[in-house]
A protein has these predicted regions:
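NTP-dependent nucleotidyl-transfer catalytic core
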Residues: 2-150
């Protein structure tokens, strides 16, 4: 795929060796913005299915917590979705992902729901590199047009 120009960057060149060995567990993430899969899911789900056939183990991470915060689009803000709507969407996505792709599914709400903001900032904030985040194109574009973080 790299020689075809389909790879923009590789976060870790060692990853290629790991992919060739098989047996790696990885996740793909999606926010529950709808109760059904759509074409936007297709490419990452298809690649995950192919990796599963090559001996890897995909896990679908559904963003029950991140879906409540917002969707990081570079040029517009998404209206907030109610907790009830997010829960309904998670049920639909989970059922489809298990049936069609056989994925294990986890929800980030399960391990974030009990963390308060002070604990989060104290325990995890130190791992966020502001320069790294500000260098990202999607963050820059949101700042340029004055869109909030969510």
């Amino acid at each position: 795929m790299e020689w075809r120009g389909l790879v923009q960057n590789i976060s870790s060149p060692e990853l290629i060796d790991k992919l060739n060995k098989g047996g790696m567990t990885f996740y793909i993430g999606t926010d529950p913005t709808a109760d059904s899969m759509h074409i936007g899911h297709y490419s990452s789900f298809l690649i995950s299915k192919r990796l599963a056939k090559a001996g890897h183990h995909p896990i679908l991470l559904v963003g029950g917590a991140t879906g409540l915060i917002g969707d990081p689009k570079p040029s517009s803000e998404r209206p907030l979705i109610s907790k009830e709507e997010v829960e309904k969407n998670i049920k639909g996505l989970t059922a489809q992902a298990k049936k069609i792709f056989g994925f294990d599914v986890v929800n980030n709400w399960d391990w974030t729901k009990d963390i308060n903001i002070c604990d989060f900032l104290r325990d995890y904030g130190k791992y966020f590199n502001i320069n790294y985040m500000l260098a990202k194109d999607h963050v820059k574009s949101r700042m340029d047009v004055g869109i909030t973080y969510a």
